[in-house]
């Protein structure tokens, strides 16, 4: 099964080797027929502490690294 890859914005880098990434998705509301934005926060592993708040990054699903962390930062420069 292929690993999921998501694009999001770093909202926190206070933890060591961990960043919190907010991923927004857009969908049509079934009743209102209106485009709605929803966001979700993922904890991702950042081995070298390269990411800063506001960076647009790609995260990829991986094995569980800790209780809450099962994503890893793939690339912080190419995500646009």
Curated annotation (Swiss-Prot):
A cellular-component GO term for this protein: cytosolic small ribosomal subunit
Annotated keywords: Ribonucleoprotein, Ribosomal protein, RNA-binding, rRNA-binding
GO BP, one annotated term: translation
Supply the Pfam families for this chain. Ribosomal_S17 (PF00366)
* Residues making up the signal peptide according to the UniProt record: none
GO terms for MF: rRNA binding; structural constituent of ribosome
| InterPro entries to which the protein is assigned, alphabetical | NA-bd_OB-fold (IPR012340), Ribosomal_uS17 (IPR000266), Ribosomal_uS17_bact/chlr (IPR019984), Ribosomal_uS17_CS (IPR019979)
Reported function: One of the primary rRNA binding proteins, it binds specifically to the 5'-end of 16S ribosomal RNA.
Into which family does the record put it?
A: Belongs to the universal ribosomal protein uS17 family.
- Protein's recorded name: Small ribosomal subunit protein uS17
- Which organism is this entry from? Chelativorans sp. (strain BNC1)
UniProt gene name: rpsQ
């Amino acid at each position: 099964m292929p690993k999921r890859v998501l694009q999001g914005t770093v909202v926190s880098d206070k933890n060591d080797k961990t960043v919190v990434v907010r991923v927004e998705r857009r969908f049509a509301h079934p009743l209102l027929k209106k485009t709605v934005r929803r966001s979700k926060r993922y904890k991702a592993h950042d081995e070298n502490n390269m990411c800063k708040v506001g960076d647009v990054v790609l995260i990829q699903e991986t094995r569980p690294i800790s209780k809450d962390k099962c994503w890893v930062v793939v690339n912080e420069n190419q995500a646009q």
